[in-house]
């Protein structure tokens, strides 16, 4: 299921992802929130602080990579704790190592959408979108000295 844009909010999972989230939010005319991860003391777990108003919103986390899913899930939990209606993530590369798929499936997240840039399969809460045609067209255009900018 997709989210309703009227009630949606784009979320950057960290400070480094703000430009990506801001660009998407601008394209979709949506607001943005940021998850600020802080470690208070050595050997303590990270604290997730939400910057922005997420109460009653369908939060869309956007990022380039998810590995084990631990940080993503902690971020989603922080958003829900702040009153988010639902949290979904759209991430380009889904490594999902060391039990990441199971971790996502048992989490409080509404779902995760990834591409098949790393081979994965649809699962309970995980949807995989194919980028094979996009990659094939980019390769064809490069081979024929054509612009690839129209693809992105």
Where do the model's predicted regions map?
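PRPP-associated nucleotide enzymes
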Residues: 1-152
């Amino acid at each position: 299921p997709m989210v309703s844009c009227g009630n949606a909010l784009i979320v950057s999972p960290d400070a480094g992802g703000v430009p990506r989230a801001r660009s998407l939010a601008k394209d979709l005319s949506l607001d943005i929130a940021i998850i600020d991860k802080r470690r208070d003391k050595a050997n303590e777990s990270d604290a997730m602080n939400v910057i922005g108003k997420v109460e009653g919103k369908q939060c869309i986390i956007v990022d380039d990579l998810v590995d084990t899913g631990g940080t993503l899930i902690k971020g989603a939990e922080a958003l829900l704790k702040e009153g988010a209606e639902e949290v979904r993530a759209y991430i380009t590369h889904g490594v999902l190592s060391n039990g990441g798929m199971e971790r996502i499936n048992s989490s409080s997240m509404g779902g995760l959408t990834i591409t098949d840039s790393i081979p994965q399969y649809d699962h309970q809460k995980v949807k995989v979108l194919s980028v094979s045609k996009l990659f094939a067209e980019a390769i064809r255009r490069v081979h024929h000295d054509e612009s690839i900018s129209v693809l992105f």
